[in-house]
């Protein structure tokens, strides 16, 4: 009775194949009726194509959600004040690291709060632990992609009304890759070149495709416009 992608806005970004093609990570909100209508608690599930087993990567085995009083706001209820990290908000858009050792996704902290901050969560298959690598970034993550060596993640984040590109390693050290009065989007790695492809627009220019060449740590990336479709 459940769907993936999630309605009404979800797309193919809400599921991902593992590099070895043996597993599928997918986004799903496994609730029905009133719970489905009120809750924003979607999780990332891992389906093993060989065994047929499904594992919830967001919650511990046997987890049972606290009872909810639907006549009151969820903000003050137990579901949002549990011991430990129960991932009760939106968890969406999984991406496996190229080496298959991690899977990352966007995660909101609170249930019932659709405007919560999107954090970037990285799950390690080695120890089953989650690490929110953008906790030090005081804003939301829009989209992201892994580097080919699986050591870093590039993401687009909003700061001072601009969408720029940032980089984080797996320990949560965040660095700015671009610093422009513009909005980047649709971020992807360009093969094994180490470069990125992204869209970019500003108050003076519509969307075009840009090549973004990251530099050594501590230096900003060099962006080169590739298309002029809207000139």
Tell me what each language-model feature is:
Residues 18, 97, 147-149, 190:
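Structural WD40 beta-propeller signal
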Residues 1, 13-19, 23-28, 175-231:
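Non-catalytic accessory segments flanking enzyme active sites
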Residues 48-52, 124-128, 168-173, 214-217:
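Short loop/turn segments that connect beta-strands within beta-propeller blades
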